[in-house]
Regions:
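Short secondary-structure boundary segments
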Residues: 86, 109, 131
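Acidic/glycine-rich phosphate/pyrophosphate-binding loops and surrounding catalytic core
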Residues: 1-66, 70-77, 81, 90-98, ...
């Protein structure tokens, strides 16, 4: 905590680039947001449409996907960046073929200095690798939202 600016500066000094400085740089739709739309058959497409209708004009739209079915929804939602989360290199390669230049592709999640070459060979536009900015082991923390169960009265 409190070191974000220094971490981003260190990436630049090391020859990397920071494509996002803060949450205000674009709309990022992640899995926890989609829980709120799980009643629809196309939650990613629905989220993209809602975000586009409410975001400032020209704001970048980024959506995190975990499967090829979700990639198809993101393509239909005409987002700017599709973030392939925790995909292996073979699935990432398939996803990149589906996207065919209709959005920038970023691979993220599970990328290490040991597997980054295999992921780069899949052909993404960007690779997000947290190993560049964290060296000390940290506790894994997450917030998981689950839909509220409706009573069957």
């Amino acid at each position: 905590p409190g070191l974000r600016a220094l971490q981003k500066w260190a990436v630049v000094l090391g020859g990397g680039t920071n494509h996002r400085r803060s949450l205000s740089d674009g709309v990022l739709i992640k899995d926890n947001h989609l829980v709120l739309l799980n009643h629809t058959t196309t939650p990613i497409l629905t989220a993209c449409r809602k975000a586009k209708a409410n975001a400032p004009r020209g704001m970048k739209m980024i959506v995190e996907v975990e499967s090829l079915a979700e990639v198809r929804q993101a393509i239909a939602g005409q987002v700017d960046i599709i973030l392939l989360d925790n995909m292996n290199s073979a699935t990432a390669r398939q996803a990149i073929r589906l996207i065919k230049g209709r959005a920038l592709v970023e691979v993220s999640g599970g990328i290490t200095l040991k597997n980054v070459r295999a992921m780069a060979a899949a052909g993404p536009d960007r690779i997000s690798i947290g190993a560049l900015t964290h060296s000390a082991p940290a506790a894994t923390l997450s917030l998981v939202l689950e839909p509220r169960r409706r009573s069957s009265r």
